[in-house]
UniProtKB/Swiss-Prot annotation:
Species classification: Bacteria, Pseudomonadati, Pseudomonadota, Alphaproteobacteria, Rhodobacterales
Membrane-protein topology: Peripheral membrane protein
Function comment: Part of the ABC transporter complex SsuABC involved in aliphatic sulfonates import. Responsible for energy coupling to the transport system.
InterPro entries per the UniProt record, alphabetical: AAA+_ATPase (IPR003593), ABC_transporter-like_ATP-bd (IPR003439), ABC_transporter-like_CS (IPR017871), ABC_transporter_ATP-bind (IPR050166), P-loop_NTPase (IPR027417)
This protein's record includes keyword Disulfide bond: no
Protein known as: Aliphatic sulfonates import ATP-binding protein SsuB 1
Quaternary structure note: The complex is composed of two ATP-binding proteins (SsuB), two transmembrane proteins (SsuC) and a solute-binding protein (SsuA).
Keyword Translocase: yes
Compartments, as annotated in UniProt: Cell inner membrane
Catalytic activity: ATP + H2O + aliphatic sulfonate-[sulfonate-binding protein]Side 1 = ADP + phosphate + aliphatic sulfonateSide 2 + [sulfonate-binding protein]Side 1
EC code: 7.6.2.14
GO MF entries: ATP binding; ATP hydrolysis activity
EC category: translocase
Annotated Gene Ontology cellular component terms: plasma membrane
Length: 242
């Protein structure tokens, strides 16, 4: 008989509840995310998706919390706001806090990969919104994270730039296959990117969908459209005329 060792999930959440003051937000969440899986969190505003992501990131010290969770040691967080320090150049933003000897060379290579290698010595105020978010993505991936937590990172971008960022993210993460948790309000974005989609409702995981649409994904694919409609209905959106 062959014995197989159980593989621990990259993210393990056990009966996690979270509240702010007297306002409960998460209720008894239990969740396993395997290593390398891309998970999207969908839900209406106030459903708890950002609170769950911030819990995994170890943020919000003022929250009352019960239960437990475990994540890898090497975690990067990507926000909707690029959060670049305005007094530092782009490349200095990327290398801040890095101790590796090849930090500058690696940062330049990553900026080249995201298409803004020529902006390395520029300051954030001179960048467009899309360029800032490319720099933020480069900063997150430069640290070779085992877990990337992304809170609506493309929400403030125009539609064309957002599509370019989707393609860029998929190409970059294919190299290292980090585990990814993405918070988004965009159903199409979730279906385009994720391996798995969780729908949060009133602080609980109400639905868990595996995305089986083949890559490269196209909204015209019947399976894409079917899942999109099911997700929209679960979010309370009538799909008859969509």
């Amino acid at each position: 008989m062959t014995l197989h060792r159980a593989i621990s999930p990259a993210v393990a959440v056990r009966r996690l509840s979270r509240a702010f003051g007297d306002r409960p937000v998460l209720h008894d969440i239990t969740l396993n995310i395997p290593s390398g899986q891309f998970v999207a969190l969908l839900g209406e505003s106030g459903s708890g998706k950002t609170t769950l992501l911030r819990a995994l990131a170890g943020l919000d010290d003022d929250a009352r919390q019960s239960g437990s969770y475990s994540v890898p040691k090497n975690v990067s967080v990507l926000f909707q706001d690029a959060r670049l320090l305005p007094w530092l150049s782009v490349i200095d933003n990327l290398t801040l806090g890095l101790r590796r000897q090849d930090a500058v060379q690696a940062a330049q290579s990553m900026l080249d990969s995201v298409g803004i290698g020529d902006k390395a010595r520029a300051y954030p105020a001179t960048l467009s919104g899309g360029q800032k978010q490319r720099a933020a993505l480069a900063r997150s991936l430069l640290r070779n994270p085992d877990l990337l937590l992304a809170d609506e990172p493309f929400g403030a971008l125009d539609a064309l730039t957002r599509l370019k960022m989707h393609d860029l993210l998929l190409r970059l993460v294919e190299r290292s296959r980090p585990t990814i948790v993405l918070v988004t309000h965009d159903v199409d974005e979730a279906v385009l990117l994720a391996d798995r989609i969780l729908v949060l409702r009133d602080g609980v995981i109400a639905e868990d969908h595996r995305v089986t649409v083949p890559h490269p994904r196209r909204p015209s694919h019947p399976d894409f459209e079917d899942l999109r409609r099911r997700l929209l209905r679960s979010l309370g959106v009538e799909t008859e005329h969509i």
